[in-house]
UniProtKB/Swiss-Prot annotation:
Gene giving rise to this polypeptide: US3
Subunit field text: Interacts with host LAT; this interaction prevents LAT activation of TRAF6.
GO biological process: symbiont-mediated perturbation of host apoptosis; symbiont-mediated perturbation of host chromatin organization
Keyword Calcium in annotation: no
Tree of life domain: Viruses
Entry protein name: Serine/threonine-protein kinase US3
Source species of the chain: Human herpesvirus 2 (strain HG52)
InterPro entries in alphabetical order: Kinase-like_dom_sf, NEK_Ser/Thr_kinase, Prot_kinase_dom, Ser/Thr_kinase_AS
Length: 481
């Protein structure tokens, strides 16, 4: 059955006159072998495919590249070479004078200890990624079979450990602790490290076990205030679809979060699948994600970095939202936009964030729409940037969204102070797709009717008309007859 028309999907000039939801007309899963399909004749289609409608996923780096990447991440994370203030008792104190960020917004702070400048810890760091290999990606070499020397208890030879610490010396001088030191701190807490995941922007993540926990756990060791901020947020949350905080340890300026271990993240899970998820599975993932977002928003929190890499999964019926390091608390009225600043990932950021406009909690709805799209298609990422770095990534990302969705000039925000409208509305002047109709990208993918409708609602270009998670959960997709 051809997909329904989407005229009037987004138009909501008055909250009291919301566009009615079309009735559910197709409840059977529809995923043919071909990714592309021909929609109904009465549905308007923009001419020609977008340039980067389904970019390929980047390959996984090998172990040598992982170490190089680690050096670059650590070296770039700190630009301030000042050391922290130390009180009479030897404890580190935060320098409040230079802190102009709000206390409840995740932001980096400088933690540095001079004794790490010349220290090369003997505690080895496990080198293999905790994720299973992904088809189409080069598997990292197994460092446990390395012939360069005797392998340590957790997976690295002394030679590899020395190389890793030498590469991290510059980062250490700027206040970051080397991964070997983080591993030593974690093992000092009684954890046995079984593997290390690719480090993120905040620190290192270890696959660990402990006598106090019957199952494997994840220890996230971070040196930035955002890790402590994440712990403070997680303590306030209690929802089955949100990653729970099992325990918290702070040692030597490093915050260690103890979290339950899931099978993998949603990105890896989808990358490994040879075929898309079924309709019921997509619905289950979407329902859990939107339920978690609705709960977080009711707590006055904006996640700001919802993406497949930050969603953890055992089965499609058992997922959870994690990584609250970029989250912030709502300032003032929840429906009033505020300048919280840019955060998260450019590929999944909402247009108003990319443009530098004030925003509300509905930026998470945009990101959730992209996650649901990837869950339904599984071989493509909508609006994804090319692999090569761009000089003006935010500007280019907005241009990609306008081009690939064929955004109409009437679909831009109407308030006069919108930078998105003032700076980018002219770029949509050549788009001849009628306003409030199906976005141009829908012509390229075979997605179940009700799932496509959910995605289109979540990807409403004007944030003022974008629905909340609670509104999306009332769609017919989640209430089949």
């Amino acid at each position: 059955m051809a997909c329904r028309k989407f005229c009037g999907v987004y138009r909501r000039p008055d909250k009291r006159q919301e566009a009615s939801v079309p009735p559910e007309t197709n409840t059977a899963p529809a995923f043919p072998a071909s990714t592309f399909y021909t929609p109904a004749e009465d549905a308007y289609l923009a001419p020609g495919p977008p340039e980067t409608i389904h970019p390929s996923r980047p390959p996984s780096p090998g172990e040598a590249a992982r170490l190089c990447q680690l050096q670059e991440i650590l070296a770039q994370m700190h630009s301030d070479e000042d050391y922290p203030i130390v009180d009479a008792a030897g404890a580190e104190e935060e320098d409040e004078a230079d802190d102009d960020a709000p206390d409840d917004v995740a932001y980096p702070e400088d933690y540095a200890e001079g004794r790490f400048l010349s220290m090369v810890s003997a505690a080895p760091l496990p080198g293999a990624s905790g994720h299973p290999p992904v088809p189409g990606r080069a598997a990292p070499p197994d460092v446990r079979t390395c012939d360069t020397g005797k392998v340590g208890a957790t997976g690295f030879t002394p030679e590899e450990l020395d190389t890793m610490d030498r590469e991290a010396l510059r980062a250490i001088s700027r206040g970051c602790k080397p991964p070997s030191t983080l591993a030593k701190l974690v093992t000092g807490l009684g954890f046995a490290i079984h593997g290390a995941l690719i480090p993120g922007s905040e620190g290192c993540v270890f696959d660990s076990s402990h006598p106090n926990y019957p199952h494997r756990v994840i220890v996230k060791a971070g040196w930035y205030a955002s890790t402590s901020h994440e712990a403070r947020l997680l303590r306030r949350l209690n929802h089955p679809a949100i990653l729970p905080l099992l325990d918290l340890h702070v040692v030597s300026g490093v915050t260690c979060l103890v979290l339950p271990k899931y099978h993998c993240d949603l990105y890896t899970y989808l990358s490994k699948r040879p075929s898309p998820l079924g309709h019921l599975q997509i619905t289950a993932v979407s329902r859990q994600l939107l339920s978690a977002i609705d709960y977080v928003h009711c707590k006055g929190i904006i996640h700001r970095d919802i993406k497949t890499e930050n969603i953890f999964i055992n089965t499609p019926e058992n997922i959870c939202l994690g990584d609250f390091g970029a989250a912030c608390f709502v300032r003032g009225c929840r429906s009033s936009p505020f300048h919280y600043g840019i955060a998260g990932t450019i590929d999944t950021n909402a247009p108003e964030v990319l443009a530098g406009d004030p925003y509300t909690q509905v930026i998470d709805i945009w990101s959730a729409g992209l996650v649901i799209f990837e869950t339904a298609v599984h071989t493509a990422s909508l609006f994804s940037a090319p692999r090569d770095p761009e000089r003006r990534p935010c500007d280019n990302q907005i241009a990609r969204i306008i081009r690939q969705a064929q955004v109409h000039v009437d679909e831009f925000p109407t308030h006069a102070e919108s930078r998105l409208t003032a700076h980018y509305r002219s770029r949509a002047a050549g788009n001849n797709r009628p306003a409030w109709t199906r976005p141009a990208w829908t012509r390229y993918y075979k997605i179940h009717t009700d799932v496509e409708y959910l995605i289109c609602k979540a990807l409403t270009f004007d944030a003022a008309l974008r629905p909340s998670a609670a509104e999306l959960l009332r769609l017919p997709l989640f209430h089949p007859k």
